[in-house]
C-alpha cells in the first residue's frame, strides 16, 4: 500500500477516486454532454497519473439527480448504450479501467417500473466486466428499484473487485458478502450529502478493517440546488487506515497504489485481526485446548441471519414489532410514502 507517488507496478494497482461536482441535468442531450466531460477528465487524469490503472467516479456523476420523475424515466439508460459507448472510448484511449454511475438504468419493464441505480466496471478495452444494481436504495427519498445481488470480478492486474453504492455501505452485511466472495477491493460510489459526513468517513474505514479489504470511496461535491455534497473521496488500506483523502473541493482527485501481494499475504498469515478467517474458525484456541480439534466452530451463531433466510416475512414482522409497521411516519410525513394515522394526545 503506497501513497504519494504517481506510479504503479506489476504488483500494485494504481487507483484514483474523484470528487466529481454533482451535475444538475434535465435532458438526454445534457447527460451525453456530461459523459463527454467525464471521458475527457479520465483521459487527462492518465496524463498526470501515468500509473493509474483504475479511475472511479461517484454515484450520480453521469446523470445528476433528476428531481423530476418524468426526466428520470426519460433519461434512463440502456446498458450497453450511448453513455457506455462514450466511456468505453475513453477507457480504450487512456488504457485505463473505470467505474461509472448510471442513474438510472432502464428496468426490464420500463417504463412501467422504476429504473435501477447502477454501477459498471469497465476494462481498458471498453468492455463491461461488472454491472451492479444498488441493493439498498436510500429510502424514503430514492425511488430506484432495488437490486438483489453482489458480484466479484477480476479487475486490473487481477485484483478482485466488488461494487457497492452509497447507502449500501451503511449495512455491514453487504461488505461481508463481498469480502466472503473474495473481493480484495470494495468500491463504494456515493452521492452523499451533509449532514452525514462524519458517519460516512467512519463507516468505510471500519468496514475496510473488519473485512480485511481495500476500500475506494468516490463521492460527489458541490451544491445542486437541493443538497450539499461533502466530497472526501478516499482510498483506504485493508487495515482501516486512510491512504489518501480529498477535502470538499469540486473535482478533487486522490490516488494510491494497492498491493495485491500485501493483502493476500495478510489474509493468509494474519492472526489476531484476520476477521474473515476467524469468523468461520471461532474459538479455535479453546477447541484445541479442549481436545475438540484445531478448526474451531464453523456454525453460524447469529439467530437473526438464519431466521431472515428461512422466514423473511416473519423476520420483517419481528423487526416491525420494535420499530414501526408502516414505511412512513406520521410525525414527519413524506409525500407518496404511506404512514399510519397520527395519534392525538
From Swiss-Prot:
EC id: 3.5.1.4
Positions of the catalytic residues: 59, 134, 166
Keyword Protein biosynthesis: no
UniProt superkingdom: Bacteria
InterPro entries registered for this protein in UniProt: Aliph_Amidase/BUP, Aliphatic_amidase, C-N_Hydrolase, C-N_Hydrolase_sf
GO function term, MF aspect, one: amidase activity
Keywords of this entry: Hydrolase
Catalysed reactions, semicolon-separated: a monocarboxylic acid amide + H2O = a monocarboxylate + NH4(+)
Limits of the CN hydrolase domain: 13-260
Pfam families: CN_hydrolase
Keyword Lipid biosynthesis: no
Purpose: Catalyzes the hydrolysis of short-chain aliphatic amides to their corresponding organic acids with release of ammonia. Also exhibits in vitro acyl transferase activity, transferring the acyl moiety of short-chain amides to hydroxylamine to form hydroxamates.
Family (UniProt): Belongs to the carbon-nitrogen hydrolase superfamily. Aliphatic amidase family.
NCBIfam families: PRK13286.1
Name of the protein described by the UniProt record: Aliphatic amidase
Organism: Delftia acidovorans (strain DSM 14801 / SPH-1)
Amino acid at each position: 500500500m503506497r501513497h504519494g507517488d504517481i506510479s504503479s507496478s506489476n504488483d500494485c494497482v494504481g487507483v484514483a477516486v474523484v470528487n466529481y461536482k454533482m451535475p444538475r441535468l434535465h435532458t438526454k442531450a445534457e447527460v451525453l454532454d456530461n459523459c463527454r466531460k467525464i471521458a475527457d477528465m479520465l483521459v487527462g487524469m492518465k496524463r498526470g497519473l501515468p500509473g493509474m490503472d483504475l479511475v472511479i467516479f461517484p454515484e450520480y456523476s453521469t446523470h445528476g439527480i433528476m428531481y423530476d420523475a418524468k426526466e428520470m424515466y426519460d433519461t434512463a439508460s440502456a446498458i450497453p448504450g450511448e453513455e457506455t459507448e462514450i466511456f468505453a472510448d475513453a477507457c480504450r484511449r487512456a488504457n485505463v479501467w473505470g467505474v461509472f454511475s448510471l442513474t438510472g438504468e432502464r428496468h426490464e419493464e420500463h417504463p412501467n417500473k422504476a429504473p435501477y441505480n447502477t454501477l459498471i466496471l469497465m476494462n481498458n478495452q471498453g468492455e463491461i466486466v461488472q454491472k451492479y444494481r444498488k441493493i439498498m436504495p436510500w429510502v424514503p427519498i430514492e425511488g430506484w428499484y432495488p437490486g438483489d445481488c453482489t458480484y466479484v470480478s477480476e479487475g486490473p492486474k487481477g485484483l478482485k473487485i466488488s461494487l457497492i453504492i452509497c447507502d449500501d455501505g451503511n449495512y455491514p452485511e453487504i461488505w461481508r458478502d463481498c469480502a466472503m466472495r473474495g473481493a480484495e477491493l470494495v468500491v463504494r460510489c456515493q452521492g452523499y450529502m451533509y449532514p452525514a459526513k462524519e458517519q460516512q468517513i467512519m463507516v468505510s474505514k471500519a468496514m475496510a478493517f473488519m473485512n480485511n479489504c481495500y476500500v475506494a470511496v468516490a463521492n460527489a461535491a458541490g451544491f445542486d440546488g437541493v443538497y450539499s455534497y461533502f466530497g472526501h473521496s478516499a482510498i483506504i488500506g485493508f487495515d482501516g487506515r486512510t491512504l489518501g483523502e480529498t477535502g470538499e473541493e469540486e473535482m478533487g482527485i486522490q490516488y494510491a497504489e494497492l498491493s495485491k501481494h500485501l493483502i493476500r499475504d495478510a489474509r493468509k498469515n494474519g492472526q489476531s485481526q484476520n476477521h474473515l478467517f476467524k469468523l468461520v474458525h471461532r474459538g479455535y484456541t479453546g477447541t484445541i485446548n479442549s481436545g475438540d480439534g484445531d478448526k474451531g466452530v464453523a456454525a453460524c451463531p447469529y439467530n437473526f441471519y438464519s431466521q431472515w433466510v428461512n422466514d423473511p416475512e416473519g423476520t420483517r414482522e419481528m423487526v416491525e414489532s420494535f420499530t414501526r409497521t408502516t414505511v412512513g411516519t406520521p410525525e414527519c410525513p413524506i409525500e407518496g410514502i404511506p404512514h399510519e394515522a397520527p395519534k392525538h394526545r
